[in-house]
Design a protein with these regions (language model features):
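Glycine-centered loop/turn motifs
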Residues: 81-85, 89-91, 115, 195-197
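Short, small-residue-rich packing micro-motifs
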Residues: 92-155, 173-182
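Bacterial N-terminal signal peptides that target proteins for export
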Residues: 5, 19, 23-39
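C-terminal interaction modules
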Residues: 2, 6, 52-55, 77-81, ...
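Short N-terminal segments immediately surrounding and downstream of signal-peptide cleavage
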Residues: 55-71
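Bacterial N-terminal signal peptides
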Residues: 38-47
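N-terminal post-signal-peptidase region of extra-cytosolic proteins
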Residues: 72-88, 95-98, 159
Length: 297
């Protein structure tokens, strides 16, 4: 039977020289070539698929103004700087005009400023005092809420933006957009929608609440300087419960929703909004939810 030459074949940029084969075997040659090429593609894809995913390590995104400080677990306090990596139980501080922005994981970020102090959990934070704004970047995973804790309440956000201000006299929560749930150690629960505010005036509380808070402060003071155990590496330390929480009720006040004019003004002058090189990721959502225009340049 006469033989025919098969034209040169291209495989991955290389040329296979012509080989004398029987006509009936031509299809077999092409099938083998296709199989080899396909196998190479599958092997390459499998290599890409099995690459392990690396979690984003917490880090400082920006420090537009000082004073700002960082204290890693077991280390002395140092000046905060952009790009610095952080660990669970790191203590962050700002004073006066100091401001910083921190990236946690899965799109969770926050800004703090003024006389503020905050401690990092693995994916949550504890605001010890001062002001902060926290959010989850649009499009990021919302499998778990971003929890911002204080000794008085925990704000849970899931694809939303919330502002907290915690002083010696009050705790104030402003939900900029979306839905925020606030839960207290005493079992009270509040849900805020876009523009709604919640406040706790510490001076107007009952004597029972004041005694409870003093006892809680005493417990916290005793814990200072004690390094966290290895078991505490993933989450913030549990809240102290000096009394049965069901017997202590705090008097919270739902404030009027923020007005359009007030919201517009705050977006234009707030250091936590305008005092950084870039706007927060959820600014357009805030403007849309509250019916606002873009802040003036």
């Amino acid at each position: 039977m006469p033989t025919r030459l098969v034209p040169p074949l291209s495989t991955g940029g290389r040329i296979l020289h012509s080989l004398p084969v029987l006509s009936k075997d031509c299809n077999h040659v092409f099938k083998q070539t296709d199989w080899v090429q396909g196998g190479g593609i599958l092997l390459l894809c499998s290599c890409l698929w099995v690459q392990p995913s690396h979690a984003v390590q917490p880090r400082i995104v920006e420090v537009p103004a000082g004073p700002a400080f960082v204290q890693l677990p077991g280390a002395p306090e140092i000046t905060a700087r952009s790009g610095q990596t952080l660990k669970t139980n790191s203590l962050l501080k700002t004073n006066k005009t100091g401001r910083m922005q921190v990236l946690l994981d899965n799109g969770r970020q926050f800004r703090m400023g003024g006389d503020a102090q905050l401690r990092l959990g693995s994916a949550n934070v504890e605001l010890l005092k001062g002001s902060m704004i926290g959010w989850i970047k649009p499009g990021a995973s919302r499998a778990k809420p971003f929890r911002i804790k204080t000794r008085l309440a925990t704000a849970s956000i899931q694809g939303t933006t919330v502002f907290l201000e915690y002083t010696d006299d009050q705790l104030k929560v402003l939900n900029w957009e979306g839905t925020v749930t606030c839960e207290t150690p005493t079992g009270q629960r509040y849900t805020l929608t876009s523009g709604q505010q919640l406040s706790l005036d510490l001076k107007s509380q009952s004597q029972e609440v004041k005694d409870y808070l003093e006892e809680l402060d005493s417990d916290i003071s005793e814990q200072k300087g004690v390094p966290p155990s290895p078991e505490a590496a993933e989450e913030l330390p549990p809240e102290s419960t000096p009394k049965k929480l069901s017997k202590v009720k705090m008097t919270w006040k739902s404030l009027n929703p923020i007005t359009v004019d007030e919201a517009q003004k705050r977006l234009e002058i707030s250091p936590l909004i305008t005092g950084f090189s870039k706007p927060i990721d959820t600014l357009s959502e805030i403007q849309r939810e509250l019916g606002l225009t873009a802040p003036s340049e």
